[in-house]
Swiss-Prot record:
Stretches for region Regulatory domain: 439-556
Protein name listed in UniProt: 2-isopropylmalate synthase
Cofactor(s) the record lists: Mg(2+)
Gene Ontology annotations of biological process type: L-leucine biosynthetic process
Domain Pyruvate carboxyltransferase: 33-307
InterPro entries reported in the protein's UniProt record: 2-isopropylmalate_synth_dimer, AIPM/Hcit_synth_CS, Aldolase_TIM, IPM_Synthase, LeuA-like_post-cat, LeuA_allosteric_dom_sf, LeuA_N_DRE-TIM, PYR_CT
Class in the EC hierarchy, top level: transferase
SUPFAM superfamilies: 2-isopropylmalate synthase LeuA, allosteric (dimerisation) domain, Aldolase, post-HMGL domain-like
GO cellular component: cytoplasm
Lineage of source species: Bacteria, Pseudomonadati, Pseudomonadota, Gammaproteobacteria, Pseudomonadales
Main location: cytoplasm
Function: Catalyzes the condensation of the acetyl group of acetyl-CoA with 3-methyl-2-oxobutanoate (2-ketoisovalerate) to form 3-carboxy-3-hydroxy-4-methylpentanoate (2-isopropylmalate).
Amino acid sequence: MTMLNDPSKKYRAFPTIDLPDRTWPSKTIDAAPIWCSSDLRDGNQSLIEPMDSVKKLRFWKTLVSVGVKEIEASFPAASQTDFDFVRTLIEDGHIPDDTTIQVLTQAREDLIARTFESLRGAKKAIVHLYNATCPSFRRIVFNQDKAGVKEIAVNAAKLFVKYAAQQPETQWTFEYSPETFSATELEFAKEVCDAVIEVWNPTPENKVILNLPATVEVATPNIYADQIEWFGRHITRRDSVLISLHTHNDRGTGVAATELGLMAGADRVEGCLFGNGERTGNVDLVTVALNLYTQGINPELDFSDIDGVRKVVEECNQIPVHPRHPYVGDLVHTAFSGSHQDAIRKGFTQQKEGELWEVPYLPIDPADIGRSYEAVIRVNSQSGKGGIAYLLEQEYGISLPRRMQIEFSQVVQGETDRLGLEMTAEQIHALLRREYLQANTPYALISHRLQEENGNSAVDAEVHVDGETQHWRGKGKGALEALVAGLPVAVEIMDYNEHAIGSGTTAKAAAYIELRVNGDRAVHGVGIDENITTASFRALFSALNRSLSQAQAKAA
């Protein structure tokens, strides 16, 4: 079978919502929602190999450590393993006072009874009821009409009240999901939810949670936002209801749907860390939270060690995080492109402590989430001078002058083209040493003596030339001018720069020279030494030898 030329014969567009006075497009998100992690339930049930109790407890502790206050721990009636995990959390004191355990149940009395039994002794708990409400599920899965689906929800809601009353020591919160909400007729979804509300009788002080899932993502995010705004306008006792979002990523827009849903008035978000979950996954709580953070809003979740969180999630889920995953992927703070690297390098140079973050191409400061700057710039055949210069400066304290950056980038480009691979900072530094610092033929500086008198300098340089030692002597107004005067070839110094590498007794000097030999094209040299004069002399010999070697190669 192949794709259809006319897909309308098999698929139909989801209808739009009649909401001409919608207000959500002009709203902004100005505070964090209530967060609920479903990693241990929705996420766990989607794994090829579900977590054992050890992994579950490790994951639970990670969720608590980052600040998630509502955690859906399991489906206690589904298995003894899930039931026992809830008991472990309660009996072994793993639930902090500011954290609420949440569990899920279907609408059957035996399952509801078992679910409440699992929570015995909990200080507070959210019990989450669901049944599917959309036309296809009513017709295909349950063979029920609207009245039958509504009756299932109402009867189960009554059982919640019954079993909660038997454990008055627990502070109960009830949650109801019209599963497949986003594919359900809005009027009917409201009708069922209103009926559940009537049974549970919430108040502004003891609210119920109405969770409105995009169980399968079937439309664009704006339609989901319209559904949420319409629902918030029409649901009974809105002041006694928390509207919760539970989006999936079937169309790749789970985060967008969640953000627009919050703009449309939702109070709460259910999802999983890094977007684990059935099929294409639940909404990624980390992305939504850090999107808020980069808009200047405290997400009330702490991802200061995002790589530590990622390690736990990967090991427990046995699924790697994609290298391009927002905020946490290996490559999301990395630039290979030359123009990007140049912009980032300039941004870092100009970024001042305490000022608004404005580094190009980096929407978040990697340091805020515990990541180093080492991987921000990496060098391959697409890279330019900016990235190379940045790595040398950050890793080795070597600040190449601008024109030398251009020259050396061509050297690096030739090497990356030859290798066909990325080059590390260590490899780039080794290439710099080979190309410049070890350029010692035909002339190798062995030692020098410098005399200063009346503002003039006299140099006696001991040089190794073709197996013999020579002395080159010259005078000038400075050490470099004196050395140039003693050279056997005509040299014109065009530019000179120097700086310290490090500080204190271990500091070294770096010198950079741009010169012409016998009127030929300009070349650069580098010298590094504890003594600044020696460093400058080594830089001159580096450039001199490179120029002569290039001229010889050209002549050949």
